[in-house]
Amino acid sequence: MPQVTLGEILAGNKDPNRVVGAFNIHNLEFIRGLVQAAESEKTPVIMMINEAVLKYGRIDCLGVAALSAAKSAGVPIAVMVDHGTDCAFLKECLDAGMDVMYDGSALPFEQNVAQTKEMVCYAHQRGRCVEGEIGTLGILEDGGAAGEQHLTTVREAVTFYEQTGVDVLAISVGNVHGLYHGEANINVERIDEIHAALGEVPVVMHGGSDIPSRLSTARCGRGYANSI
């Protein structure tokens, strides 16, 4: 199947009851398992590779393996670098044919905008997509603390999108990486407000591993079929 971009795979999801899942892979076994599961369920997926994992596995090894598997799959699969902060490395990934998430959420707003916009311009010249993030989850992917959680405001989301032109926007609405300590407290109303303000712009959430299915269903019922 022809390679698809992150933007295409999210824009192509018109089913209000379906979430597009994104799953981190670490090696060939993860790649094969994800492709087999996607084909079995006949559903498009996003294959994510953490920046540190890809630096270790190398673009010309792990990256090429992921791209090759996606292209030969029987369902649409987008390949993207997850939570990247190294702009030079991310540009190499874009050159190789991957989409990227540039995560400048820990930076001051203006710097996040400037860095993300630079990545967007570079990616669009190559027909690739960029996901940006505004707001912080409070917990890193490895479970370490990343400071206080900062929920994305509607104004921040709109301003960030208008100034960067990102293809996909990741937001913070109570979601965290890994397991929750107690009940997950997802601000569904904030998602409503951001979605209404941004219209057709794909809005995604990271840290979906421990979000209860009832909350995922609630998001889908409101039209948020695009979630990571």
Where are these regions (language model features)?
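Alpha/beta enzyme core
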Residues: 4-16, 26-52, 60-76, 84-202, ...
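Conserved residues at beta->alpha junctions
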Residues: 24-25, 207
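Cofactor-binding active-site loop characterized by glycine-rich and histidine/acidic residues
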Residues: 56
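Conserved acidic functional residues
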Residues: 80-83, 206
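Short acidic/histidine-rich active-site segments
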Residues: 207-210, 228
